[in-house]
Amino acid sequence: DTRNAHKTASGSYLVAHERDGVVREYDAKGSVIWEYAVPLFGRERAGGHSPEAFGNQLYSAVRLPNGNTLIGTGNGHSVIEVTPEKEIVWKLEQNDLDGITLAWVTQVERLPNGNTRLVNCHAGPDNPQIIEVTPAKQVVWTFHDFDTFGNSMPVALVLPAE
């Protein structure tokens, strides 16, 4: 399954292959020019979408201006930033945020101020659906409306106020 694809500034395409647990970058002719397999970090797979599940079924990947790739690891409950050499240089894990549990981390975005915004799907009624964090993993703000959206908010577009 392919969850989403983004065209990069260089004209290639960055594609999140959920079932394979791999981000692949394709050139304009469809040839793979880079790929990154999301690791299991020494853990065993556990099926499902809830916070108790675990795997590497990533949901999203975006290329950052510095050339690194920001990845929403899906049921890996994390956000990772990896270099072109495949080194993890930043990671937000399931229980890094005080009072918040990450579940199926879907859409991710690095904001111009350096903060990271992520969508936290399938996290249950006690956790926010959208979270913005600083590079130091401090929560800036959250959106939490389980009554309206439940566990079914895999993507969100947050626009600036006019």
Label for each model-derived stretch:
Residues D1-E162:
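Histidine-/acidic-rich catalytic cores in large beta-rich domains
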